A protein has these predicted regions:
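Perimembrane loop-to-helix junctions flanking transmembrane segments
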Residues: 49-63
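Extended, low-polarity transmembrane helix blocks
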Residues: 1-46, 62-73, 77, 84-196
Length: 196
């Protein structure tokens, strides 16, 4: 039995040769996410700054101009760095901060779910109400619209805007912060090799 276990463990250990694939996958997944977030902020900085600072319909953050620029540049620049695998542990820090701000300043009041699904775990009252509203919207669209055409690109959903995506990105960034960019396919790896 011990021999079987050792052989299985050896076979499993052989896969460590490809352990660079996990951080590479995280980087490739996160790069377009942060590129879109950062470039959208940069495309209209006056509106972004106003949203960061306005306490009535925005985030109500102090120093909105500074924080908006820091967030936008961290996200857009971070996307490029993640893609190249350059300074990944360093850029993970400000990106984690932006995710924490997103979680607590934007998404927290909406609960966990990003897309309202009353049958999923962590459904709050807002999500439970969304199911009834979605059913009514579908009835209206079936009666008064071309429902088949309207749903030909996908079904309708109600966006709940909960913390789910921001929390997921935070966990992914945490893994990159502690594990680094990975070997072989990252600039960090090759720079470290040159410095040794």
């Amino acid at each position: 039995m011990k021999t079987v276990f050792l052989r299985l463990q050896h076979a499993l250990d052989v896969t460590r040769r490809a352990d660079f694939l996990a951080p590479l996958a995280l980087r490739l997944y996160l790069a377009p996410v942060f590129w879109m977030a950062g470039s959208q902020k940069l495309a209209d900085m006056p509106a972004t700054i106003e949203w960061f600072g306005n306490p009535d319909w925005g985030l109500g953050l102090p120093f909105p101009e500074l924080l908006a620029w820091l967030a936008a540049l961290s996200e857009a620049g971070g996307a490029v760095l993640l893609l190249c695998g350059l300074a990944v542990r360093w850029i993970s820090l400000p990106l984690m901060v932006t995710m924490l701000v997103a979680i607590f300043a934007v998404h927290w009041p909406n609960g966990w779910q990003a897309i309202a699904d009353p049958s999923a775990p962590f459904a709050n009252a807002q999500v439970l109400e969304a199911g009834e509203k979605l059913a009514r919207a579908r009835e209206i669209l079936r009666e008064y619209g071309n429902y088949d055409w309207l749903t030909s690109s996908g079904s309708f959903a109600i966006v709940n805007n909960g913390i789910e995506f921001a929390a997921t990105y935070l966990v992914m960034l945490l893994a990159l912060f502690f594990g680094g960019a990975g070997k072989c396919l990252s600039a960090d790896f090759w720079i470290a090799q040159k410095l040794r």
